[in-house]
């Protein structure tokens, strides 16, 4: 009897309206006779996945080139199938296999469901259940020769959905559960064109590169190597005829306050003259900067000086035991002053102590009492204050008196006071970055400077009038807005209806106010990335409060609840979750972190690390904590930011528990897998996935996987498909019942 082997080879369909995923896969007919020297079959490998998209207004043409490799010793045949996301308006669909055009059969959702369920029954693998309820394209693929490559090309056109002027493009990339190996080469390139000037261009799913070409065009790119994608690619964009565009995205479930994102971005015009700014570069030349650190700092400063705009003014302050300004005033960025600045930079010598307070005060002194120019300080240091004022609170208090200044700090290495630099940045509406010894300081500084090169709107104020009440907005203090950049504000709201929003600030020396009409929805549950991004920033804010100001019960409890609900797992949040569930005496079968809960040695190690998180201000673990917090506080994409924050936390753990030690092995157990699927967090314990909503529910029902009762449950709750697709053993809450799905 033939058996079916499901081998996923890519995600080919786009769902611009539906937030569900659409995955392409091959069902390979396994031969009756299988040579004993080659059993079981090795899955097909995706060697390349290239996506090219052209969007004109709301019309998107998506072209996909994929190459698949059959590593088996036998010829294979089967069906290539891909589900159509709900609501997608697909037109002009074409497909090539091995260079030949083929016709795909379109099956309606009821017939497609039968195919999905048949495969699940035979394979005893529920991964396809997330597609139940979708139409399906199906085409036969033959032959798939042994040890050969099979190229497949797909092209389709669709009309993208616009919600109050915000257009969404979705390309399903989440092939983690299907891919046999990481995809060697993966790229997504989008050429975007609009009749009106483009404003916000934002991906809530991936870190993308955005290159704008004038006011109406942009190219968006994402590339990776050896990746198993587990997040669909999503792009949100808008147009606006005003100098600054503002768009609102909401998420409002029943019975709860809403969540929102505000996207603010300046429109771009090649003819616009860059606004003038004042910049002071403050460089640490103390003895500890000797070697590569000072050389990279010099290269970074030369780059910044050479890239000053024509109307900018600048100053350079070198400091070690004392501060030494070059010009003692702001000077024009003409060729003569740039030449003198580069000569000054060339003469830097690493010697002496670290007079941080004096250096920053020297920088702030050159700011005129009355000026329309944005005033920016770029501060590079690798040490702690050892000369002059050394009390961090006093240093921060003195700096805050210089209102209007923005101090962007770069901490180099691990001997920096991260709390001091973070508080300086927070108090001046800027941010801090930390550059490790093995990282490229020049690249970090030059990338940052390119970002802030052209101010668009400074000293921002946002007023959301009307009956809707907003709260817990992050960032709490709005930073300045620069050309080519955008501001993403995440918050909560109560109420619903139309709001007149006013965004004001200084643009080119003039106060300007922009007015927008926004609508806060009474119910909307499509953009489920919105609450998780808000929660990521909120957790960053709460942990920062604990790290800087001390722990309270309220801070701890809210951090724990958000981390569990949204799957924001780091060593620190894992510890809080375990301790909370222990205190509440949650049954072991329902616990999120069962292995850590049952291992007292692991809990002791993580508890020790939690104490270090609250107390460490410098050192490898102190810098790791700061970088982890920055990943959360300034999150643009929740999945990437959570992964980055967790990675930084683990790096800090490694400093306290070197690799190969029992402590390191125990600490590594914290990183058990969690997934955020269709608005819910699930935690993996062995071969079981546990719904974060499943605790404290009395009514429970056990259902055998792959039984008729199992498929009836899916029929009754079609929304459960993506959750059931996690595996054969799932603990899942639906309505008032917790279902224990088990083999």
Residue ranges, per PLM feature:
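Pro/Ser/Thr/Gly-rich intrinsically disordered low-complexity regions
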Residues: 4-7, 12, 16-52, 96, ...
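Hydrophobic beta-strand segments of well-ordered beta-sheets in folded domains
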Residues: 185-189, 377, 406-407, 728-730
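Subset of Sec-pathway N-terminal targeting signals
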Residues: 19-261, 493, 504, 550-584, ...
